[in-house]
Amino acid sequence: GATVSQAVPFEEKVDNAAGIVLGKVVDTKSQMDASGRWIVTYSTIRVEKAMKGQAVSEVTVVTPGGRVGTLNQSTIGVPSFHEGDERVVFLKNTRLGPTVLYFDQGAYDVATDSRGERIVEPVQSDAVHMDTQRGVAVANEEPRTLPEFEKAVQAAIKSRPQRVEMSAVAERARQQQQKNGTIADFFARNKVVIAIAAIGAALALWQLTRK
């Protein structure tokens, strides 16, 4: 069956990326990891522009899979890099070094169209991305011109404080709703006890007023 992963909204990818770079792959090298069981590939990208994070001239990203001698390992949903590829990559820091955030959802191909415009679109992937709340497959993001893509990244960065605040407000409302529900449940479960207590209070008040 197909490999299924949770679809990640664009703004969430921007929020969680340690860096976002545009650049060209200038070198790839695959080798066994320290355990000697798994192949990892190191791809060096000459950075043209950092859309988010520290401006660097080069970044080397590590991804699982690759080829060492006659041994080949690959994982569905993990992007591969080849010399000459032009990419936008969302970065995540790991103990092995930077990797691609959300794997195939964090890497984009950059190609030049017939009019000479650079177009950014998600890398091809065999994985199916699902909206887990609605339980439906999500279509890939539409191709965008490079300026449009950069604008979307900057808009997401700029809107983050507002979105965080809105999320906090929604969470407080949810907690209040739960609290109100708990109080209502308490009254529903204990209405006999509450009724007896109310009768007791009324009798006590009646006794006081008689004196």
Language-model features and meaning:
Residues 1-211:
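Transition segments tied to proteolytic processing and entry into folded domains
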